[in-house]
Amino acid sequence: MGENFNRHLGSKLRMRRLALGLTQTKVAQAINVTFQQIQKYEKGTNGISSLRIMQLANFLKVPVIYFFEDYPAYNSP
């Protein structure tokens, strides 16, 4: 689950960032990481901690659940 989940989170991050017209650098500055770290998040190379998910959700103006929606394991009984 880990690798697929990381890719899912990264995909959701990238979709929202692009929808808002933000650069990786702007997002990185907002949560105090490097733009390279945002790249790794978006590719699913690195996992995203719960603290970072909360920071990202706040900055990207989405509920935390946004990152988990559409993930198969989340929707199963």
PLM regions and their residue ranges:
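Short basic helix-loop element that most often maps to the first helix and adjoining turn
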Residues: 11-26, 55
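Short, charged recognition helix plus adjacent turn
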Residues: 68-77
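A generic secondary-structure micro-motif detector
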Residues: 3, 42-43
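Short alpha-helical DNA-recognition segment
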Residues: 21-40
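A detector for short, charged/polar N-terminal pre-domain segments
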Residues: 1-8
